């Protein structure tokens, strides 16, 4: 992870309380040019699997509208849980380390990183998307997928900012951090 702290996106999600899953999620809730991927992924690891993990770690949570599950306290609990699970699995988290190149080698992969060379039998790239560049989001995952000849589906905006005129922004500033249910038509 090139960041100096793990899980920055997790910590900001759900207004700092981490909207961590929704038991009502089905493949129909995901837009994709490859709907079979969503079916396959959600059958292998369901929202209930993640909820069971959260409960095993004793994280209190609450349901908001339409099945959205949030931590009662803080998204820090989800990050701590994930780091604990990594530790128990023997995974090593390397911060302030960026991957420069990845190449296929006999029986695995070789990574050139900012802190040296690593080799592994299998590799999972969890890099997010392009949604929040200020949080470190880049096109790295797409570049690696292209390098290994994987098909890339066209991307679409999933998270978009509201851009306001300066006068309106100033007028609405006192509402910062306030959320309410809305429908956009």
Functional labels for PLM-detected ranges:
Residues 45-55, 65-89:
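An accessory alpha-helical subdomain
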Residues 11, 15-17, 23-25, 35, ...:
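Short capping/connector residues at structural and topological boundaries
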């Amino acid at each position: 992870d090139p960041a100096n702290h793990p899980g920055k996106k997790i910590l900001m999600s759900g207004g700092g309380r981490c909207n961590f899953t929704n038991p009502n999620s089905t493949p129909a809730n995901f837009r994709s040019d490859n709907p079979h991927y969503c079916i396959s992924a959600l059958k292998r690891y369901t929202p209930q699997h993640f909820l069971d993990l959260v409960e095993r770690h004793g994280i209190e949570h609450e349901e908001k509208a339409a099945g959205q599950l949030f931590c009662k306290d803080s998204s820090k609990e989800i990050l701590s849980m994930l780091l604990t699970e990594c530790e128990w699995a023997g995974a090593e988290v390397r911060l302030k380390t960026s991957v420069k190149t990845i190449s296929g080698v006999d029986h695995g992969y070789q990574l050139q990183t900012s802190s040296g060379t690593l080799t592994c039998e299998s590799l999972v790239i969890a890099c997010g998307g392009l949604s929040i560049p200020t949080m470190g989001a880049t096109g790295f995952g797409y570049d690696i997928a292209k390098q290994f000849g994987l098909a890339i589906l066209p991307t679409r905006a999933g998270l978009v900012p509201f851009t306001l005129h300066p006068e309106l922004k100033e007028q609405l500033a006192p509402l910062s951090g306030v959320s309410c249910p809305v429908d956009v038509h």
